Amino acid sequence: MKFPLLLALLVGGASALHLSSETSDSKSPLMDENLPRDAEISGPEGEECPPGEELMPLEGEKEEGSGSEGVPGDEGAVSGQDVTDVDLQCPKEEDTTSLMGDSGCKTCRYLLVRRAECFDKAQSVCRRCYRGTLASIHSFSVNFGIQSAVRGINQGQVWIGGRIKGWGRCKRFRWVDGSSWNFAYWAAGQPCPGGGRCVTLCTQGGHWRLSHCVKRRPFICSY
């Protein structure tokens, strides 16, 4: 009685051992070579600039960018959005001076507004009160004409319509009216990292400087 039972147990054990060996030799679905590896399914490392949008770092600036980008108020100014100020009041006539257009643009009109505003507010005043924008400058003659008209005011700098757009390696200088950035008249050492993201024109000499967009300054509209 005991011998047949023992024989049955031995045969059953050998069958189970053979089945286990076959299972271990087969491939696990979790290790299938056709499944993507971690490197293949990971997301992109970072956003790349569109073709032609790269800008070399500003003078003395490291690739990772300057600390000025985190200055409160500057980010909003470079977005190009107008100030949502329902109580915006247009400047009084005595606070403005009309400037002549240059010989290459008889229809161009410029306006000096002596009332000091931040960059965003200045752009909003130009748009809402004069149906224009902060001035874009594309030639030395225009730059010289504007500087000659503003050098008598008791302010060292005035806003024009230039700004830095984008971040990191994708930073570029742009005009708020969307025109081409084909002329610049920077002061020595400019554009300077940490100096801000909006562009001013110096009333003495006419050179340009970067400034923090939240500063209040007189400004030049073109319309």
Curated annotation (Swiss-Prot):
Residues 20-81 are annotated as: Disordered. Residues 1-16 form the signal peptide. GO terms for molecular function: carbohydrate binding. The keyword Protein biosynthesis does not apply. Pfam families: Lectin_C (PF00059). Glycans are attached at residues 23-24, 66. Residues 17-106 form a propeptide. Cytotoxin and helminthotoxin. MBP also induces non-cytolytic histamine release from basophils. It is involved in antiparasitic defense mechanisms and immune hypersensitivity reactions. This is Bone marrow proteoglycan.
